[in-house]
């Protein structure tokens, strides 16, 4: 296959050349199916595993349509996390660089005033998180948000998350400023086809529009994870999980490996980051309590391999494109099996081999069984590191490092900033209701 196949899908010549320059020459299944239908003007619901090229599946037809009349605000992409928004914006900018495309990023943690200025310049594409865009809709003037009333495309990336109650209020606010649904194309993409997403595909046809195109890439043998992914578990006592983690990361097999450690709580991420750093592991972290610039820097450090270990909450489980991750550790087991799939999807990408290791305590047995049922695969027991090695080599110094980390966090008031911000938000909500 050659880049002419993207041309046969209907992509503009300039875009085909841009993709070719980036060594993107063979369309994936989701791209082959969705690009032509979107170019026909159909709404689209696309489902495919993580790493399957969903961004190009919606970006390519949007850019092709935009280039036919490159004026004003043309499309909005909503996504649940800041990091995903920045990554999508990078891709749009790269694909459209030859056409002087203007892309605005509208996410939390950045200057609201600067974002308003960018929106006033009428960027061609807006990549946003729902909360921050909703803020502009409610509070910024007509000169800032007026262009949103004429957009041609709305994309919900990671639609299964955006359609949950967490985002419902902000999402409704964002949509309220847009043209009616029969005057715009609506594209939903997800790695998990939830009931909410499927319900939209079964909704009555919008008058004056062709029927919604729905496409889901079927998983081989009903397994929702790559065939090149090795899944293992390790039974670990809760109180010594840090010691086991350190022993694995510094073992001969993994001492040079690129690794993401997933945890369920921000405080756990911070404890592990500090503990491992004091033990001379090149580590960084990514969680919601970090200022946006720190979050951005952290992802960049990990991508550049300045840090080989990333400690993350599920902020990093969706869509982040980090080329080579050799090991994913579920330090905490997620309650939702689909979350495990998204975490595991950070490794074994593009046909490469990868490993996923679950730390399993007594309370996690049912969660692991639910994951195995979901992926239709039994995990193998991890045997590379045993109890004796942990006790002999790691336990004492890791325990001391953790104690120092906890003392430092207590002294710095870690978590107080979040409580303060929560009180501020609650105060704003009360003021908003009164007005």
From Swiss-Prot:
GO terms for cellular component: cytosol; nucleolus. Its EC number is 3.6.4.13. Residues 409-435 are annotated as: Disordered. Residues 409-429 have a biased composition (Basic and acidic residues). A motif (Q motif) lies at residues 4-32. Pfam families: DEAD, Helicase_C. SUPFAM superfamilies: P-loop containing nucleoside triphosphate hydrolases (SSF52540). Residues 35-211 form the Helicase ATP-binding domain. It catalyses: ATP + H2O = ADP + phosphate + H(+). GO terms for molecular function: ATP binding; ATP hydrolysis activity; RNA binding; RNA helicase activity. ATP binds at residues 48-55. A motif (DEAD box) lies at residues 157-160. It is found in: Nucleus, Nucleolus. It comes from the Eukaryota. One of its GO terms (biological process) is rRNA processing. Keywords: ATP-binding, Helicase, Hydrolase, Nucleotide-binding, Nucleus, Ribosome biogenesis, RNA-binding, rRNA processing. Residues 244-391 form the Helicase C-terminal domain. ATP-binding RNA helicase involved in 40S ribosomal subunit biogenesis and is required for the normal formation of 18S rRNAs through pre-rRNA processing at A0, A1 and A2 sites. Required for vegetative growth. Belongs to the DEAD box helicase family. DDX49/DBP8 subfamily. The Q motif is unique to and characteristic of the DEAD box family of RNA helicases and controls ATP binding and hydrolysis. PANTHER family: ATP-DEPENDENT RNA HELICASE, ATP-DEPENDENT RNA HELICASE RHLE-RELATED. This is ATP-dependent RNA helicase DBP8. It comes from Kluyveromyces lactis (strain ATCC 8585 / CBS 2359 / DSM 70799 / NBRC 1267 / NRRL Y-1140 / WM37) (Yeast).
């Amino acid at each position: 296959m050659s880049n002419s196949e993207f041309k046969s899908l209907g992509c503009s010549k300039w875009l085909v050349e841009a993709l070719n320059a980036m060594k993107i020459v063979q369309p994936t299944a989701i791209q082959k199916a969705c690009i032509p239908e979107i170019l026909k003007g159909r709404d689209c619901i696309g489902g495919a595993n993580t790493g399957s090229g969903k961004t190009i599946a919606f970006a390519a037809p949007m850019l092709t349509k935009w280039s036919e009349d490159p004026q004003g605000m043309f499309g909005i992409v909503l996504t649940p996390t800041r990091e995903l928004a920045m990554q999508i914006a990078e891709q749009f900018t790269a694909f459209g660089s030859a056409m002087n495309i203007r892309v605005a990023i509208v996410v939390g943690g950045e200057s609201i005033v600067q974002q308003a200025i960018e929106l006033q310049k009428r960027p061609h594409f807006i990549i946003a998180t729902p909360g921050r865009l909703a803020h502009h809709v409610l509070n910024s003037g007509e000169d800032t948000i007026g262009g949103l009333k004429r957009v041609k495309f709305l994309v919900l990336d990671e639609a299964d998350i955006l359609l949950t109650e967490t985002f419902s209020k902000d999402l409704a606010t964002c949509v309220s400023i847009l043209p009616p649904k029969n005057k715009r194309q609506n594209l939903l993409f997800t790695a998990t086809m939830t009931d909410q997403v499927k319900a939209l595909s079964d909704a009555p046809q919008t008058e004056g529009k062709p029927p919604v195109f729905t496409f889901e890439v079927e998983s081989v043998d009903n397994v929702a994870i790559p065939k090149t992914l090795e899944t293992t578990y390790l039974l670990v006592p809760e109180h010594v999980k840090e010691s086991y983690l350190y022993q694995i990361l510094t073992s001969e097999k993994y001492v040079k490996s690129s690794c993401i450690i997933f945890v369920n709580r921000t405080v756990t991420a911070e404890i592990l980051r500090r503990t491992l750093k004091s033990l001379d592991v090149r580590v960084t972290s990514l969680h919601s309590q970090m200022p946006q610039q720190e979050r951005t820097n952290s992802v960049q450090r990990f991508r550049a391999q300045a840090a080989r270990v990333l400690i993350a909450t599920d902020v990093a489980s969706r869509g982040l494109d980090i080329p080579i991750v050799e090991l994913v550790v579920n330090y905490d087991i997620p309650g939702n099996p689909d979350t495990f799939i998204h975490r595991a999807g950070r490794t074994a990408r593009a046909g490469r081999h990868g490993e996923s290791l679950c730390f399993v305590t007594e309370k996690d047995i049912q969660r692991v069984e639910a994951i195995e049922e979901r992926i239709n695969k039994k995990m193998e027991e991890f045997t590379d590191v045993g109890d004796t090695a942990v006790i002999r080599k790691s336990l004492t110094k890791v325990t001391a490092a953790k104690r120092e980390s906890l003392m430092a966090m207590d002294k710095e008031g870690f978590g107080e900033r979040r409580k303060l911000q929560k009180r501020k938000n609650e105060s704003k909500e009360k003021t908003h209701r009164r007005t």
